[in-house]
Amino acid sequence: MAITSEIIGKLGGADVEVTPVSGTTSGSSGSEVILHTIEVPVGETWLVAVYGNLNGAYSDNYSSPQIYIGDTKLHQRATNGINSLAHIGTGTIEVKLRRNTGNGSDSFTGHVYAVKI
């Protein structure tokens, strides 16, 4: 997130959209919940970042949940606690929480930051 914070900080007066997000998913492996959707206007490219608290049923193996921004994903061995991820994209960009186990439930609470670059 340090790199993302530095980039956003250098954008100066740019309008950074900040959206609080929260979601929980349970069920089979592969189940997911969309935390936020960003519609990037045609001809524009945006930086989208997510920062927040990941709470997974498992956090020490390949069963830990993942955060996605578009096709960019958080490492599958992410630990519970504060995590961050950034993506540069166009078109429709979804921020999702995806399960990798069928046991328990996974949740995420944080913020999505989006800005035209």
What are the residue ranges of the model-derived segments?
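Extracellular jelly-roll beta-sandwich "head" domains, especially the C-terminal globular C1q domain
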Residues: 4-117
